[in-house]
A protein has these predicted regions:
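An extended, acidic
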Residues: 1-114
Length: 114
């Protein structure tokens, strides 16, 4: 994860607990960038970045990005490792290995899925 590039819409995502979860991962990433919204998922699918972390999403915010990322071989889950299609807290990763590193960091801040 220390070589990962992480994107998010903005650093103060969702609630205070969401922000703390984001920081738990961001503090381990090589590079963190903000402000690209759904374009981050396109960058992930294209192999340009490694990780996207968001919170407070609606179903319509994430369903199309899930299709794009998964078609490119990436993974999209909620912060508990379950389905993300209803929105809420979402993590998208380029690989299963990276997801396996990220989920334990997010777990203390994960809320029940929608």
């Amino acid at each position: 994860m220390d070589q990962a590039t992480l994107f998010s819409t903005y650093p103060e995502i969702g609630t205070k607990k969401d922000y703390q979860g984001f920081r738990a991962v961001a503090d381990h990433a090589n590079l963190v960038r903000y402000g690209v919204d759904c374009y981050a998922y396109a960058l992930l699918a294209a192999g340009q970045i490694d990780l996207v972390i968001e919170a407070g999403l609606n179903a319509y915010d994430i369903q199309a990005p899930i299709a794009v990322v998964e078609a490119a071989g990436g993974l999209v889950t909620n912060w508990q490792g379950g389905p993300a299609h209803l929105g809420g807290q979402v993590v998208a990763c380029a690989s299963q290995d990276l997801l396996n590193e990220v989920l334990p960091l997010l777990a203390p801040y994960a809320v029940a899925a929608k």
